[in-house]
Amino acid sequence: MTKTSKPRQTLKDRVRKIYKHNRLCQIAFDELENDIEVQTLLEDSNRMAIDRMGYSDHGHTHSLIVSMNGTKLLKYLSEGIQPSIVQEGTGTLEDAELIVLLGCYLHDTGMVVSRHNHDIFTVMLISPILTRILEKVYPNDKKKQIHIRGHILHAIFCHDTAAVPYTVEAGVVGIADALDMTKGRARIPFELGSVNIHSASAMAIEKVNIKKGTEKTVRIEVIMTNVSGIFQIQELLEKKIRNAPGLIEHIELYAVMAPTSEKILEEELRVL
């Protein structure tokens, strides 16, 4: 008897699965995936980033990975600090997860206009998109739609360290963006000949782990095969964490040398 192989989960399937207990996120995620404007913006953002500028992935795959990172990070952080919308008494943890999902998924769509100030262009482009998606999520609550939209726009505006995130959710979106730093993302520009400290250091990042912390609420481990990965950690991830004043006290950050790598460093180095 031939054993049938289990179908391989796609990245999209994995992201959808993490929202199985949150109906708000399920609705929003399906709306995002089936929205022609959203998908075209992601496609064209990637075209700007990779084809025209020689940058790493800023399209659909990046959006999915950042959404997954953000949701996982928020889950662990909520054990030590409540999301701002919960602290302020205007929403629930499910609402906070929705803010993080939409902020993470849409944060780079302004790249279709320009890399410079893309956070501002994203806010301009996605405001009407958010309006129609949130009408589906909260069909009978206009006030809630407007309130949640404001949270999402703040998170997107602050994701690139140009502005300080004043909510937990906004800080999570920025950090989740930086967590997509593994060599898989850097491989395309690297193979196209865009070799610089950014792409070379990213090629040294094997894996990123988000887990329950020992001394702080969350522990982030960046697994490296080469010491050059330290640049990626300090210039991108550490800056994003330090830019989120409400979260830095809850995150411990470690650079960890992979077992097969040359031991220029000790097995792990605490960064934060």
Predicted regions and their residues:
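Short amphipathic alpha-helical segments, especially helix-boundary/capping motifs
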Residues: 40-48, 98-103, 146-147, 152, ...
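Glycine-/proline-rich flexible loop or hinge segments
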Residues: 45-58, 103-110
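His-Asp-centered metal-binding catalytic motifs of divalent-metal-dependent phosphohydrolases/nucleases
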Residues: 66, 90-126, 151-159
